[in-house]
Amino acid sequence: MSDLKAYLAAKYMSGPKADAILARSSDPTLKKKRKKQQTNEDYIGGSVKAEASGGLMLRDEDEVWGRSKNEDEEDDAPVIGKDLATFKGSKSSWATVANKSALPLPQAEPTSPQDIKPDIKEEPDIDGPAASAPVQMTKRRGGLRTAAQLKEDTERELAEQRSPSPAEGEERPDPTETVHRDATGKIIDVKKRQEEERIREEEERRKEAERKEWTKGMVQRRDREERRRLEKKMAEADVGRSKDDVRMNKEMKEEERWNDPAAAFLTKKKKKGPRRPKYEGPWAPNRFGIAPGFRWDGVDRSNGFEKKYFQAQNTRARREYEHNQWSVEDM
């Protein structure tokens, strides 16, 4: 404890107080005498003693006055200098943990005020001196610090608590932006909600256009697409067309007209595309001219009504013919 007082007096104090501390630390023979605890000596000792009777012991005032004067003179004996003031000894509150630690602790070297510097967290230089990371000060655990340093650290901590710095690559939030919440308190992203609404409206418009196309019929849609394709080809083709134009002649031959007299004996165009299979072979006629399916095995499993119906028609037609022939036989 005396070494600490001597170090502080040598480095940070001046005047008679510092001189007294340095003188006491340099001379081991000088020790400060502690004052004896004052007690009420009026009841201790004196010319009259009553120990036998168990009463109080009295002491003369002259004897007490002289003894207290001598004690004061003895207490003032080691005083050196003028207006001397010393540190009051106090019990240290630091706990030694050297016995519990297996690693040796480094000894702290005394430093001057010029050598005291803030602790700076060193980071590796990745991209050179131009891209070095910003200096970050760590929290100090102890040591002497000036009022300016304490004020600066306090202001910096308060600023970090009020507005924490965003992570790298993230945009700083706008403090003036309005925050919307739902009934449960959850934050609503207005931009995301608007984007979802726009996508939903586009999907509804597309479905509405598809429903309108469904009502127009497949044939009309196919004709429209064919006309659009033809117009595109005509826009790319030459303006002049002669009678030897192969494409024009082919289109005119493939076109069907309801009042064409040669449509009955001309070769009809073959329709391309998938076709349903048909039954190959003879089959009994019916009133509606419906052909059997291609999986029919040729066995008639009906009740015979169609067959009787055609026989009755043929019989009536034959009788009418015979009646007409008989009626004109005499002519």
UniProtKB/Swiss-Prot annotation:
Involved in pre-mRNA splicing. GO terms for molecular function: RNA binding. Disulfide bonds: none annotated. It is found in: Cytoplasm; Nucleus. One of its GO terms (biological process) is mRNA splicing, via spliceosome. This is Pre-mRNA-splicing factor CWC26. Transmembrane segments: none annotated. It comes from Cryptococcus neoformans var. neoformans serotype D (strain B-3501A).
